[in-house]
C-alpha cells in the first residue's frame, strides 16, 4: 500500500495540484490581459475605458464573468443543441490544455516533454474544430460563413508558423521548449565577441522569421487586422452570432487563452524566455517568471496596438499574404538558415 501511494497516488496528487494552480493563475492573467486590451484600445481612442468596477476598473473582467454566468443561455430553435453547447467547451479546453508544456521559468513546467513544440502545434491546430462546430450547429448563414473563414485562415497561417518554428529548431536542435530558451544564452552577440545580452536571442539572428511569426500569430488567433471570422461589418459577429451568456464567455476565454499562448511562444522562441536582457548580477536576481511575464506582456501590447491602428484586411488580401508572401518567404528562410548553419557550423 505504501509503495502504491508513493509511486502512483502522491505524484498524481502533485500533478493535479500543479495543474489547478496553473489554471487559476492563467485565468487571472487572462482576466487582466482582457482588461489591458480594452484600456489600450480606449487610450488610443482618447477614452477612459472600464473604470467603475474596483479601483481604476481593475475588477471589470470579474464583473463581466459574473454577468455572463447569471444570464440564461438561449439556443436557436433550429440549432443542434448538443454540438451547439459542446463547441465552446471544446474551444476553451483545447486552448487551456496547451499550457501543460509551456515553461514560464527554468523548471516551472508541468510536463517537460522532449516534443513540447510539436505538442503545441498539434493541439492548437485542433482549436479550429470548436469554431467549425459552433458555426455549423447554429444553423444560420453568418455563423457558418464565419466558421468557413476561420478554417481557411487558420490552416493557411499554420503552415507559415510551422516553417518559422523549423528555422528555430535548425538553430537549436531540440523540440524541447526549455532547451530552446537555454540555447539563447549564447547566440549571435557572443559569437561576435559581445557580452551575453538580448542580442543573443533569436529575434535578431532570425529577424525576418520573427516578423512572419508575429503576423501569423495575429492571423492564427483571429486578432485584428485578421479578425475575418467575426467581422462585425460583414458577418455581424461571425461564428458567435447566436451565442450569449456562458457559452459566449467560453469562446472569448478560449480566444484570449490562445492569444496569451502565442505571446508566450513568441517570448520562448525569439525573446529569450525567462532570461534577463543583460547577463549582469543585479538583473539575475529578478526571478525568471517576472522576465517571462514582462516579455509576454510586451508582445501582447504590440498585439493590442496593431488592433487599435491597423484596418481589417479583405479576405482575398488575407489569403494572398499567407500563400503568396509568407509561405515562399518561410520556405526560402528554412533553406537559407540550413545553408548558413552548415557553412559556419554555428548550430
From Swiss-Prot:
Task: Give the enzyme's main class according to its UniProt record, as a single word.
Answer: translocase
Q: Where in the cell is it found?
A: Cell inner membrane
Keyword 4Fe-4S on entry = no
Q: Where are the transmembrane segments?
A: 13-33, 82-102, 115-135, 161-181, 198-218, 258-278, 286-306, 321-341
Keyword Cytoplasm appears in the UniProt entry: no
Q: What is its EC number?
A: 7.1.1.-
Principal cellular location given in the protein's record: membrane
Q: Which reaction does it catalyse?
A: a quinone + NADH + 5 H(+)(in) = a quinol + NAD(+) + 4 H(+)(out)
Q: Name one GO molecular function term.
A: quinone binding
UniProt family annotation: Belongs to the complex I subunit 1 family.
Enumerate the NCBIfam families for this protein.
Answer: PRK06076.1-2 (NF004741), PRK06076.1-6 (NF004745)
Q: What is this protein called?
A: NADH-quinone oxidoreductase subunit H
Record the organism.
Answer: Rhizobium rhizogenes (strain K84 / ATCC BAA-868)
Amino acid at each position: 500500500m505504501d509503495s502504491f501511494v508513493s509511486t502512483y497516488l502522491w505524484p498524481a496528487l502533485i500533478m493535479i495540484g500543479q495543474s489547478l494552480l496553473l489554471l487559476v493563475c492563467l485565468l487571472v492573467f487572462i482576466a487582466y490581459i482582457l482588461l489591458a486590451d480594452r484600456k489600450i484600445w480606449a487610450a488610443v481612442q482618447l477614452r477612459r475605458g472600464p473604470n467603475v468596477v474596483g479601483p481604476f476598473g481593475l475588477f471589470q473582467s470579474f464583473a463581466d464573468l459574473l454577468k455572463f454566468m447569471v444570464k440564461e443561455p438561449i439556443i436557436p430553435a433550429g440549432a443542434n443543441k448538443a454540438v451547439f453547447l459542446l463547441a465552446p467547451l471544446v474551444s476553451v479546453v483545447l486552448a487551456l490544455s496547451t499550457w501543460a508544456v509551456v515553461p514560464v521559468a527554468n523548471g516551472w513546467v508541468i510536463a517537460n516533454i522532449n516534443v513540447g513544440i510539436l505538442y503545441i502545434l498539434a493541439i492548437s491546430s485542433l482549436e479550429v474544430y470548436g469554431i467549425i462546430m459552433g458555426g455549423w450547429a447554429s444553423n444560420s448563414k453568418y455563423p457558418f460563413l464565419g466558421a468557413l473563414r476561420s478554417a481557411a485562415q487558420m490552416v493557411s497561417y499554420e503552415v507559415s508558423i510551422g516553417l518559422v518554428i523549423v528555422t528555430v529548431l535548425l538553430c537549436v536542435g531540440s523540440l524541447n521548449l526549455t532547451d530552446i530558451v537555454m540555447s539563447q544564452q549564447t547566440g549571435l552577440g557572443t559569437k561576435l565577441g559581445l557580452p551575453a545580452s538580448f542580442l543573443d536571442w533569436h529575434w535578431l539572428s532570425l529577424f525576418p522569421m520573427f516578423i512572419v511569426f508575429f503576423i501569423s500569430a495575429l492571423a492564427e488567433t483571429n486578432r485584428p487586422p485578421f479578425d475575418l471570422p467575426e467581422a462585425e461589418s460583414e458577418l455581424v459577429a461571425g461564428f458567435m452570432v447566436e451565442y450569449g451568456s456562458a457559452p459566449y464567455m467560453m469562446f472569448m476565454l478560449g480566444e484570449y487563452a490562445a492569444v496569451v499562448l502565442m505571446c508566450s511562444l513568441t517570448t520562448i522562441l525569439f525573446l529569450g524566455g525567462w532570461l534577463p536582457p543583460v547577463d549582469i548580477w543585479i538583473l539575475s536576481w529578478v526571478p525568471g517568471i517576472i522576465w517571462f511575464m514582462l516579455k509576454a506582456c510586451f508582445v501582447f501590447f504590440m498585439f493590442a496596438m496593431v488592433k487599435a491602428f491597423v484596418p481589417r484586411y479583405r479576405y482575398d488580401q488575407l489569403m494572398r499574404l499567407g500563400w503568396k508572401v509568407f509561405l515562399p518567404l518561410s520556405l526560402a528562410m528554412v533553406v537559407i538558415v540550413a545553408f548558413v548553419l552548415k557553412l559556419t557550423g554555428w548550430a
